[in-house]
From Swiss-Prot:
Mn(2+) 2 binds at D81, N113, H163, H237. Mn(2+) 1 binds at D53, H55, D81. Pfam families: Metallophos. The gene is Ppx4. This is Serine/threonine-protein phosphatase PP-X homolog 4. GO terms for biological process: double-strand break repair via homologous recombination. Transmembrane segments: none annotated. Belongs to the PPP phosphatase family. PP-4 (PP-X) subfamily. Gene3D superfamilies: 3.60.21.10.
Length: 306
């Protein structure tokens, strides 16, 4: 795949226009070559801008890039949940993946609980692929790539980034590095917990109402951060009406990047910019105005309805 091909595909995807099934296959093949070399805990250099859940809200991702700057000018770290629930999971994920292939050192993608075959069959991505491409091949190519995404990232050895949270099975970074990540998200265990767990105002661990992962308290965060010489845990996974929420004496932050979530929650979104000294700056943004959203593409009516 030539650089000019890739640039054309990126331009098309930025306009919310789909690329062909063959192009998706080639893009995913190239992406796999890059992602397979990345660690379970990917090292990321500052300055970097951290983004939470996007959930197929393509036009709001365009707002995010307006606020945070375009890739590759800005170094980005996305904390997973690129797909499901929104109307444009296909274009959202493929654009982020194309940027990853084009600028591998300027964008890091880690896996969320929705980067899963099972979950996408329920929450929209599967149906969207079928509707837009008329077959499941694109869904298969993309979900195969999900298995190669990193499970976490560490910025300058000091900031631990993960989609969901901590796990009672994980004491150190080496415990994460020991996971065989190239598989469907399991129903329980360390890999599952990283994508499903949530912080809560409790002590220790509790079962999660989500049915997967755990709730974990400030004492757990304190212990993990001390043991691993970490200053901050940065995670996503939970809607925050104000766009971000700091907890546990500034030892953990939730960043949420899908404004007006599901097109009805009325929340703002945020991204977290870290400068080269890891100084934090939260940027708040709102959903893209209606006129920036374009019209949903009308599918031609199949002959048998005419």
């Amino acid at each position: 795949m030539s650089q000019s091909d890739l640039d054309r595909q990126i331009a098309q995807l930025r306009n919310c226009e789909n690329i062909t099934e063959g192009e998706v296959k080639a893009l995913c093949t190239k992406a796999r070559e890059i992602l397979v070399e990345e660690s379970n805990v990917q090292r990321v250099d500052a300055p970097v801008t951290i983004c939470g859940d996007i959930h197929g809200q393509f036009f709001d991702l365009m707002e995010l890039f307006k606020v945070g700057g375009d890739c590759p000018d800005t170094n980005y770290l996305f904390l997973g949940d690129f797909v499901d629930r929104g109307f444009n999971s296909v274009e959202t994920f493929l654009l982020l993946l194309a940027l990853k292939v084009r600028y591998p050192d300027r964008i890091t993608l880690i896996r969320g609980n929705h980067e899963s075959r099972q979950i996408t069959q329920v929450y929209g991505f599967y149906d969207e692929c079928l509707r837009k491409y008329g077959s499941l091949n694109v869904w298969r190519y993309c979900t195969d790539i999900f298995d190669y995404l990193s499970l976490a990232a560490v910025i300058e050895e000091k900031i631990f980034c993960v989609h969901g949270g901590l796990s009672p099975s994980i004491k150190t970074m080496d415990d994460i590095r020991a996971i065989d990540r190239k598989q469907e998200v399991p129903h329980d265990g360390a890999m599952c917990d990283l994508m499903w767990s949530d912080p809560d105002e409790i002590e220790g661990w509790n079962l999660s109402p989500r049915g997967a992962g755990y709730l974990f308290g400030g004492d757990v965060v304190d212990d993990f951060n001390r043991k691993n010489n970490i200053e901050l845990i940065c995670r996503a996974h939970q809607l925050v009406m104000e766009g971000y929420r700091v907890m546990f004496n500034e030892q953990l932050v939730t960043v949420w990047s899908a404004p007006n979530y599901c097109y009805r929650c009325g929340n703002v979104a945020s991204i977290l910019e870290l400068d080269e000294n890891l100084a934090k700056s939260y940027k708040i943004f709102e959903a893209a105005p209606q006129e920036n959203r374009g019209l949903p593409a009308k599918k031609p009516i199949p002959d048998y309805f005419l």
